[in-house]
Amino acid sequence: MKLDYWQENFFKVNLILLILIFFLMSCSDQIEQEHDAATFNSLIEEYDFHSSKINIVIKDNIDIKGRPTTAGSLALEGNIAKDNAYLVQKLLDNNFHIAGKANLSEWANFRSYYSVSGWSSLGGQTYNIVGLDFNPCGSSSGSAVAVAVGIVDVAIGTETNGSISCPSSVNGIVGMKPTVGLVSRTGIIPISVSQDTAGPMGKNVTIVARTLEAIAGYDPKDSATAEIPQNFDFNFLENLKQSSLKGKRLGVLQSDLSDRHANDLLNKLQTILEQAGAEVVLLNDQRAYPYEDEYFLLKYEFKTGLEDYLLNATESKKTLEEIIYFNEQNAETVMPFFGQEILLESLETENLIEQYQRAIDATQKTKAETIAFLKSNKLDAFVGLTRGPAWKINYEGGDDKAMDDVPSFSMGGFAAISGLPHLTVPFFQMEQFPIGVSFIGLPWSDKRILELGAALERELTNYDGKDFIAMENTPIKSSFLIIDVRSDAEVLEGQLQDSVHIEWTQIVDSIDTVTSSKDQQIYLYCRSGGRAGRAELILKDLGYQNVENLGSIEQASNILDRKILKLAN
């Protein structure tokens, strides 16, 4: 772990709002004791990682006894978990230390069609590790960035469709979506009983496999786990070091990759796999994706699943309707950027049982076609590029609009809808952003998929191309930089959207952690302009010529057209 890197960047770049103030746990008593994180220094001094256990952070839609489980929503701010989620207890029983909770896209990105991934009304905006202008994807945003920045080696995310694979890929880490049913969902705020799963996200395949060993298994409270085959091999670590791509038959999906750079990377991947001894089969994918049926299924199951969860929760709101009402009454803080049309549509599905059955039939048909596609081509796995590069954060039109400006491709949808294991391993880069390589296999082939990922990971040592970006200590890139030079305590009262925090007295020691160019445009602000003026003179003495003092936070907000975001407290 790179604790020194975390200390340098935790508040300064506001990357993840990773461990929210009221989630902090001490190592000696990881469930009972809270810490006062009023200032950055007191947080670092008081908070220690366990020296002899595997430190891990948990996405904040998963129960930890005595801690809030919020799904990033202010509506659930007081939802204190009665018990540990099944997977959390298994982690504690297997020498893991729960270091804290990670921010996520609110309601696991299931609130609005125009949502901004990585943003939640409770936790604020999580940023991509490479650039503050860019989105970390979601919904397991904080889990991905926590690993990418080096705070922990592994985290737990959840996925309904893309919520592990996407943030893992765009932040340059390994992410594993297991076969649905391999990991219990008990104690997790749900979207869909058909597609939900939790899974590990880590710095390499080995730690991901180790974590999956710990959390996998039968849970009598989750009927999906009863589908685990009786002879299933849970020893995911067993053959990782000896695994090889030699002789493996891998199918490259020739889907619509209209982007030249994506095709170039796919061709490079084919060459690398073949040089490693794999047999690569180019597949003409004619499957039709049932978008409307899948989304209806998710909306129908969300209402039922959420209300089942709330029934036994400490949260006083027990229905989706009450959640919606709370959001409406607190729209200024809950919905400053986008609405809740998905929640409203979910509410309307309640009695549409026949349409729900049609949706089940359609998605099951797609699953059968996908499994048949793998089997008929005698494949060990599908392989391909996980998804396109990160897109810019856009609060005006959300991800939907922002993704129009970047190459858009992905291969995780069929795995999600079919409940198949999906592993992404960081390998390439595009436009300075990571691109993962995905392996997708048959149900319960999780061990084989991990072995393929470990074998590909080793190919990095033999690969002399420059298409892989190492995430650790990567300078933050942006067209311009906004620096808040106030004190730590002042920042807790609110911070300008997209700004980083460096107290003016620390500017000399810390400026090179947020920019690698003395030509970059830098804007400074504070409470009234005085400290920003002193910081401006210091930076110009250091050779930074494009520096401007914007005065107070309110003046900076008006000049730069940036909102003032209040941090969780």
List PLM regions with ranges.
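Bacterial N-terminal signal peptides that target proteins for export
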Residues: 2-15
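C-terminal motif of bacterial Sec signal peptides marking the signal peptidase cleavage site
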Residues: 25-26
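Gly/Ser-rich catalytic/binding loops embedded in alpha/beta enzyme cores
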Residues: 29-161, 179, 267, 271, ...
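A short helix-breaking turn/cap at a secondary-structure junction
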Residues: 39-46, 177-264, 460-467
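Short helix-loop capping/hinge segments that flank enzyme active sites or metal/cofactor-binding pockets
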Residues: 53-71, 247-251, 300-365, 424-433
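Gly/Ser-rich, acidic/histidine-flanked active-site/gating loops
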Residues: 56, 62-68, 76-77, 90, ...
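Glycine-rich, small-residue loops and helix-cap segments
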Residues: 344-472
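Rhodanese-like catalytic fold shared by cysteine-dependent sulfurtransferases
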Residues: 469-473, 480-481, 488-521, 530-569
